[in-house]
Design a protein with these regions (language model features):
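Contiguous hydrophobic, core-forming segments of folded domains
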Residues: 57-124, 178-189, 193-205
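Extracellular/periplasmic ectodomains of large secreted or surface enzymes and adhesion receptors
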Residues: 205-248, 278
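Short, hydrophobic/aromatic-rich segments at coil-to-beta transitions
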Residues: 19-25, 41-48, 68-76, 96-99, ...
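Divalent-metal coordination cores built from histidine and acidic residues
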Residues: 140, 286-294, 300, 308-384
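Solvent-exposed helix/loop surface patches that form functional interfaces
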Residues: 31-33, 84-169, 196, 212-222
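N-terminal, post-signal-peptide region of Sec/Tat-exported proteins
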Residues: 36-71, 145
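Histidine-rich, glycine-flanked metal-binding segment
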Residues: 253-294
């Protein structure tokens, strides 16, 4: 604990380095697809963030002005989103008031409680800035603008080799900004070393060899989180389940009918019965409270991730046709869902094979010849 307190104190009291250019490479499935460059000069940071995968990706230019404590007092963001929408975002904090403008419109609030702004279209560099602020906070949790609470949990410290020597980077779990945490690593000086997910990473230039290890660890942390959620929230019914007092849609009559009792066992609906039909031995009975029971939806074009698996279930999507993915990542995800380790929809793997070009997706399998393409077809067929 003392080590992290000293690190936080150092990061809070020391201004950013003078005239330092921090460069990162953007990697998708281990392939270099772009860059992030941060030109740090005293309390001013100029950022160039650009990557392209499958012909799409953000083009972002940021200018951040920081106060003496490292909190943003002005933030201007211009460019385009991955699908080409214009980005024109700004933030300013002055005289105890914060004002901002993003794609949802304009807003303002008192900046006495929350001082850190979370941008709508910022680069990953800003996550390192927020992580440093959270490390300097006593409980590593703080209110942020435009709203919400960000929190930070310390994970493992790992050493990575590169041209500037070994770096002992500590991984952190940053929560509160999205439905799933972000996983990022800071070096001993508190500077961003990497941001990682199971399929994507932003890594300090020269240390790209850390990509796979970082992504594997991000997948491990993500899996552990969803395993905990599964243990807390999942219900394991040993016998048939009867939901009473529910309405169902009759596709022949095009109307809602009922109330009925719907009985299922394992993964099949056994019967739709009168609401007062007798219960058989060993059933679990659930009161549907007059709701409407609808079939699970089928997502016909998905690129599912572990973070999205549970969200699909929560949204009523119980089956997904995955149109392209990292095969190793997807295979592990399917196995964890099928054995009940985590929650997720049934996944039909639709093998993705693409020729190499400037517009290639780095997801699935890239080939250059007819023979390579046929070999990949055989590879997928053997795993159907």
């Amino acid at each position: 604990m003392l080590k992290y307190l000293l690190l936080a104190a150092t990061m809070l009291s020391a201004p950013p380095a003078i005239a330092e250019v921090q460069e990162y490479r953007v990697l998708s499935g281990g392939n270099d697809v772009g860059h992030l460059k941060a030109d740090v000069e005293a309390q001013r940071v100029t950022i160039d963030y650009d990557y392209k995968n499958n012909g799409r990706g953000p083009t972002i230019a940021e200018v951040i002005s920081l106060d003496a404590e490292g909190y943003p007092i002005r933030w201007d963001i211009d460019g385009a989103t991955p699908f080409g929408n214009k980005v024109d975002e700004s933030f300013a904090r002055e005289d105890g008031r914060a004002t901002w403008r993003d794609a949802t419109g304009e807003g303002q609030a008192a900046a006495t409680g929350a001082r850190f702004y979370v941008p709508q279209n910022g680069s990953p560099w800003s996550l390192g800035l927020l992580a440093r602020a959270l490390l300097a906070d006593e409980d590593r949790s703080m209110a942020v603008l435009p709203g919400g609470t960000a929190s930070l949990v310390v994970r493992e410290t790992m050493t990575f080799e590169g041209p500037d020597g070994p770096v002992a980077a500590t991984m952190y779990e940053l929560s509160g900004l999205d439905l799933n945490p972000s996983y990022l690593a800071l070096d001993p000086e508190g500077e961003l070393f990497a941001l990682a997910s199971p399929r994507f990473a932003v890594v300090r230039a020269g240390y790209e060899a850390a990509d796979q290890r970082l992504r594997d660890y991000a997948e491990q942390l993500s899996t552990e989180r969803f395993v905990r959620i599964q243990k807390e929230a999942a219900h394991d019914f040993e016998g048939p389940v009867r939901i009473r007092n529910v309405y169902v849609f009759d596709p022949e009559e095009m109307t809602r009918t009922g109330p009925y009792a719907v009985v299922w066992h394992d993964d099949r609906i056994s019967s739709v019965q009168p609401n007062d039909a007798p219960v058989t031995e060993g059933e679990t009975v659930i009161d549907g409270a007059g709701g409407t029971l609808v079939p699970g939806m089928y997502e016909m074009h998905g690129h599912i991730s572990q973070g999205g698996a549970l969200l699909n279930i929560a949204a009523g999507v119980t089956s997904v046709r995955d149109m392209g993915n990292e095969n190793d990542v997807l295979g592990g995800l399917i196995q964890r869902i099928e054995d009940g380790t985590i929650a997720g929809p049934r996944i039909t793997r639709s093998g993705f094979i693409e020729g190499k070009s400037p517009f290639s997706s780095q997801t699935g399998e890239l080939v250059e010849t007819k023979e390579e393409a046929l070999e990949q077809v055989r590879w997928y067929a053997a795993r159907d």
